[in-house]
Design a protein with these regions (language model features):
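Polybasic (Lys/Arg-rich)
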Residues: 1-118
């Protein structure tokens, strides 16, 4: 039943955020997070027990080459201020792709901030 109440948040990250996130995979349950494989040129390699997390293909020659997917409960997306603070904290170092309502909420938040300070 939990699976039916989950929504996938997908974003792509710049290298600095990818490196930060790959070190802190304990934030979400292991069956609810998927992260990009490392750059082949990167000397860092995941330890064997964490290989299952690194299942998404890196997008070569892209400004945001590291896709990340996190399955979260619907209520987290709608009401959890900590989740939104966490996502917004990455600022221009991530590009949120889905769900669309989160993309729109982030656009509105940054538009409101821009109006406030300009």
């Amino acid at each position: 039943e939990l699976k039916n109440n989950l929504v996938t948040v997908r974003f792509r990250a710049k290298e600095n955020i990818y490196k930060f996130l790959r070190e802190g995979l304990q934030r979400y349950p292991s069956n609810q997070i998927r992260i990009s494989k490392p750059d082949p040129k990167d000397s860092w390699k995941p330890i064997s027990q964490s290989l299952k997390f690194f299942s998404l293909e890196r997008i070569a020659d892209d400004l945001f080459p590291y896709p990340i997917e996190i399955d979260i409960p619907n209520w987290t997306l709608k009401k959890d201020i900590d989740f939104k603070r966490w996502i917004l904290g990455f600022r221009e170092s991530i590009l949120i792709e889905s769900p669309e309502n989160l993309v729109e909420e982030v656009k509105e938040t940054y538009s409101n901030l821009n109006e406030l300070y300009n």
